[in-house]
Structure formats: C-alpha cells, structure tokens
Amino acid sequence: MSITLSTLLDLKKKSEKFAVMTAYDATFAYEMDQAGVEVILVGDSLGMVLQGHDSTIPVRLEDMVYHTASVRRGARNAFIIADMPFMSYGTPDQAMAGAKQLMQAGAHMVKLEGGAWLCDAIAHLSRQGVPICAHLGLTPQSVNKFGGYKVQGKEASQAQLMLDDAKALEQAGADILLLECVPTKLAKQLTEEACAPVVGIGAGPYTDGQVLVMHDLLGVGAGKKPKFVKNFLAGSDSIQAAFKGYVEAVKSGAFPAEEHSFNI
C-alpha cells in the first residue's frame, strides 16, 4: 500500500508511531520499502555520509535531484521527502524553483530548515500544492551559526521560541514538523500541540515518528556516533533484518529509549 500524507495524519490521530529513514539510492530504498519503512528522507546528510564533507553545506540542488530520482525508482510504497539544500530557498520564488525540480524527480514532499522566517516561502509552496516538512531545533545547515551540533531549546526562552515557530510554520502551510536534538519534554509538548505529524531525531520517544540516518542505524562510517543513534545491524543477520528491527522498535515505542534522549 502506498503511504500518503493522509496515511501519516491518520497514524497521528490513532497515536500510532511511524518509521522514517534516510536513503540515497534505489537499492537501499527498495530494502526499506520491503521492511515497511513508511517514510524515506532523501537527506542532504548525503554530503557527509556519501560525499565525505564535514557538513551538509556543500550539497547542491542537482545532488538532491539526482538522489531523489534514484530513491523514487527503488521505493514504490514509501512516502518520499527530499531536503532542499543550503541557500536554495531564501525567497519564495527560489524555493518554488527548487521544489519543482525535486517534486518532478519523484519527491512527495520537500523539507526546509528554519523558523518563522520560512513562513513566506512555505505559504507560497503550499498555495501551489507542494507538501512541506519544516525542520526545527538543530538545523544542520546552520551549524556554523550554532557553533557546532548542539541541543537546542534548553533554555525557557529558546523553548518558547521553538513552540511559537512551530505554530507559525504550521499555520503557513507546513504539513509535517521535524525536530532535531531537542529536550524530550519540549518535543512532547510540541507534538501534543501540533495538528501536523511530528518526526523526531534526538527528540525523545513522544514524537509521532522517528528518523535515523541509514549509515548511523547500520553502524557504518568514521567518527563518534551521536547520543540518539542505535546500531540496529548489531545482532541482526542482514541489513533487511536491521531495517525491520528498527521499524518494529519505533512502532512499539522501544526506540528511542532514555539513553538516546536529552532529558534536560
């Protein structure tokens, strides 16, 4: 069965969790589809895990279009979200031009990083029938402004700003919200207040969906893994089994556990 935005809204209404994973090619997208992953994110994380950069900033729109098309050819049932890369949505018209390419490549939704300043671009896209995911909290394209990959929303003023931004973005037309590296308590409140499905990564167990970068989930790649990551390949006899284990853990609420969350 093909997953649609309506499917995800129904899951939220029924308080049923859904699993999200990143993919960048047809083969792994197919395996995720077979494992029951509801949503595949074609992430600009490809800049780090595929291209070897130390951030997502060097990723180009043409990179995202290429990998989105590859994923679409492999996944026939999953709902596909494609990241809009750094500096590709500064104005509504610029956002529309990029979204057009990604949607024509096979995306069902595009993702933008930022707060309420995105509202004009989101409203413009929404009026034209483009589904949008708004990414809040730790937004990797702003890593240089943050001074590193740090938990966001720890202070009361930061938390309130994030809640206000989420409401503004949803009112502007955001269909899904994604929270990265935010305290569990804040993510829980935001998820309860939002009508849109909320996906978390490093945001505790109370969001409607969970997302992990595929390479992190499989325990591959150099460097120390973030606190919110779990290696699902360890103890599994295949990549397919690891993907299924992740889906089951998300749906049952077993993942993320307290050890993967920021209880601040």
UniProtKB/Swiss-Prot annotation:
<feature type="binding site">
    <location>
        <begin position="44"/>
        <end position="45"/>
    </location>
    <ligand>
        <name>3-methyl-2-oxobutanoate</name>
    </ligand>
</feature>
<comment type="subunit">
    <text>Homodecamer; pentamer of dimers.</text>
</comment>
<feature type="binding site">
    <location>
        <position position="113"/>
    </location>
    <ligand>
        <name>Mg(2+)</name>
    </ligand>
</feature>
<keyword id="KW-0963">Cytoplasm</keyword>
<dbReference type="GO" id="GO:0005737">
    <property type="term" value="C:cytoplasm"/>
</dbReference>
<dbReference type="InterPro" id="IPR003700">
    <property type="entry name" value="Pantoate_hydroxy_MeTrfase"/>
</dbReference>
<feature type="binding site">
    <location>
        <position position="111"/>
    </location>
    <ligand>
        <name>3-methyl-2-oxobutanoate</name>
    </ligand>
</feature>
<comment type="function">
    <text>Catalyzes the reversible reaction in which hydroxymethyl group from 5,10-methylenetetrahydrofolate is transferred onto alpha-ketoisovalerate to form ketopantoate.</text>
</comment>
<keyword id="KW-0808">Transferase</keyword>
<dbReference type="Pfam" id="PF02548">
    <property type="entry name" value="Pantoate_transf"/>
</dbReference>
<comment type="similarity">
    <text>Belongs to the PanB family.</text>
</comment>
<feature type="binding site">
    <location>
        <position position="83"/>
    </location>
    <ligand>
        <name>Mg(2+)</name>
    </ligand>
</feature>
<dbReference type="InterPro" id="IPR040442">
    <property type="entry name" value="Pyrv_kinase-like_dom_sf"/>
</dbReference>
<comment type="pathway">
    <text>Cofactor biosynthesis; (R)-pantothenate biosynthesis; (R)-pantoate from 3-methyl-2-oxobutanoate: step 1/2.</text>
</comment>
<dbReference type="GO" id="GO:0003864">
    <property type="term" value="F:3-methyl-2-oxobutanoate hydroxymethyltransferase activity"/>
</dbReference>
<dbReference type="InterPro" id="IPR015813">
    <property type="entry name" value="Pyrv/PenolPyrv_kinase-like_dom"/>
</dbReference>
<keyword id="KW-0460">Magnesium</keyword>
<dbReference type="GO" id="GO:0000287">
    <property type="term" value="F:magnesium ion binding"/>
</dbReference>
<keyword id="KW-0479">Metal-binding</keyword>
<feature type="binding site">
    <location>
        <position position="83"/>
    </location>
    <ligand>
        <name>3-methyl-2-oxobutanoate</name>
    </ligand>
</feature>
<keyword id="KW-0566">Pantothenate biosynthesis</keyword>
<protein>
    <recommendedName>
        <fullName>3-methyl-2-oxobutanoate hydroxymethyltransferase 2</fullName>
        <ecNumber>2.1.2.11</ecNumber>
    </recommendedName>
</protein>
<feature type="binding site">
    <location>
        <position position="44"/>
    </location>
    <ligand>
        <name>Mg(2+)</name>
    </ligand>
</feature>
<feature type="active site" description="Proton acceptor">
    <location>
        <position position="180"/>
    </location>
</feature>
<dbReference type="GO" id="GO:0015940">
    <property type="term" value="P:pantothenate biosynthetic process"/>
</dbReference>
